[in-house]
Amino acid sequence: MTHSQDLFDRARDVIPGGVNSPVRAFGSVGGTPRMMVKAAGPYVTDADGVEYVDLVNSWGPAILGHARPEVVQAVQDAAALGLGFGATTPAETELAELVTDRVRVAGVDGSPDRRPIEKLRLVSTGTEATMTAIRLARGFTGRDLLVKFAGHYHGHSDSLLAEAGSGVATLALPGSAGIPEAIAAQTIVVPYNDLDAVRAVIAEHGPRIAAVITEAAAANMGVVPPLPGFTAELARIAHDNGSLLISDEVLTGFRVHPAGYWGLDNAGLAADHPDAWTPDLVTYGKVIGGGLPVAALGGRADVMDHLAPLGPVYQAGTLSGNPVAVAAGLTTLRLADAGVYRALDIAADILIYAVELAFDRAGLAYSVQRAGSLFSFTFGTPPEHGITDYATVQAQETWRYPAFFHSMLDQGVSLPPSVFEAWFVSAAMDEASLDRVIRALPAAARAAAAATPPA
């Protein structure tokens, strides 16, 4: 028995399923989760001393790699001054200023820069950020209904688990037990990338729809970018109805571009370009905390000022803006310069090419989807129109992934334990770590090709 197995058995005695987030349990790939005890640069090390190239990267935050010395030092310095005060600190303002300044695209032909984030509220988790965004949208508009897309994951609050991605997709759950029907009925789910479906819902329920929420680029059912012009038209539809557009950048924010997916999608576009779009509210998480629990909700000042203490929409948190966590986030964002994003894109380019080469040589049918440096793949022949929604993602040959995953793991590469999750590269990946992944791919591809569907 490995030490990881022994530790996992011990965990299951006192923690439901042995994990504190379901996808970590290896439920869709089988086997025993590795108990990780150390992370540095592009590597993680398990309780048995085995080192892995990490393509999970804490599910996104570790864009610089693990335990970057400057981030560790900032955390130590902040902790030495106090772990938390229950009061506002200057660092919270610095982080809010950094985000409002960073999330912009340059103006075109002399026009001013476009900045969708006028004010920011810090919270601790992405779930809190999206939950607050929904409450704020309802409070601002005086309406009750929410429109979301099938396969999009916005955290585990009651309003947002219907036909969600991430762990809900991994476990093939319709949502979650424990959500009252009355609450579920306030969320209308439509197919992703289907504007006609959105228009139909608006036509039927328009006066009651407070907001449309969308992942800026879907990345919790695998990576599925919006079709060209989709989000711009979605914004027009929402705004024409008096509804808000909420862009969930918990996963994509500050990972795929210095200004998040909004910056990637709007770069070089004038404000009046037909493909340009501006959300009313944006949620952030993961990278903004640099590996510690920080998330945020930002957007239009007139909407944000409806939050207490200025407005009637209540939100609070004992650990919101925790100084140690904010120090990690501030330092990470300050270090995440243009060179970091070039490194992320180059690493993604190299690995995507290597995956395609290995899959082609193994005779696998597949497709690769990408948004910036985020990418994933689906097994099986994709439909003619490509992978564009939750239904096409779910139709893939998911049964090939466990064999692929465990072959990579056995060769020292840690991948997400679900085919419905993105691969996360880091700027710490060097020639040696990339080479280990590349060398592991051919055998893993052959294992996937040899896999058979369950009886």
Curated annotation (Swiss-Prot):
<comment type="pathway">
    <text>Porphyrin-containing compound metabolism; protoporphyrin-IX biosynthesis; 5-aminolevulinate from L-glutamyl-tRNA(Glu): step 2/2.</text>
</comment>
<dbReference type="InterPro" id="IPR005814">
    <property type="entry name" value="Aminotrans_3"/>
</dbReference>
<dbReference type="GO" id="GO:0008483">
    <property type="term" value="F:transaminase activity"/>
</dbReference>
<keyword id="KW-0663">Pyridoxal phosphate</keyword>
<protein>
    <recommendedName>
        <fullName>Glutamate-1-semialdehyde 2,1-aminomutase</fullName>
        <ecNumber>5.4.3.8</ecNumber>
    </recommendedName>
</protein>
<comment type="subunit">
    <text>Homodimer.</text>
</comment>
<dbReference type="InterPro" id="IPR015424">
    <property type="entry name" value="PyrdxlP-dep_Trfase"/>
</dbReference>
<keyword id="KW-0963">Cytoplasm</keyword>
<dbReference type="GO" id="GO:0030170">
    <property type="term" value="F:pyridoxal phosphate binding"/>
</dbReference>
<dbReference type="GO" id="GO:0005737">
    <property type="term" value="C:cytoplasm"/>
</dbReference>
<keyword id="KW-0627">Porphyrin biosynthesis</keyword>
<dbReference type="GO" id="GO:0006782">
    <property type="term" value="P:protoporphyrinogen IX biosynthetic process"/>
</dbReference>
<dbReference type="Pfam" id="PF00202">
    <property type="entry name" value="Aminotran_3"/>
</dbReference>
<dbReference type="InterPro" id="IPR015422">
    <property type="entry name" value="PyrdxlP-dep_Trfase_small"/>
</dbReference>
<dbReference type="GO" id="GO:0042286">
    <property type="term" value="F:glutamate-1-semialdehyde 2,1-aminomutase activity"/>
</dbReference>
<comment type="similarity">
    <text>Belongs to the class-III pyridoxal-phosphate-dependent aminotransferase family. HemL subfamily.</text>
</comment>
<dbReference type="InterPro" id="IPR015421">
    <property type="entry name" value="PyrdxlP-dep_Trfase_major"/>
</dbReference>
<dbReference type="InterPro" id="IPR004639">
    <property type="entry name" value="4pyrrol_synth_GluAld_NH2Trfase"/>
</dbReference>
<feature type="modified residue" description="N6-(pyridoxal phosphate)lysine">
    <location>
        <position position="286"/>
    </location>
</feature>
<keyword id="KW-0413">Isomerase</keyword>
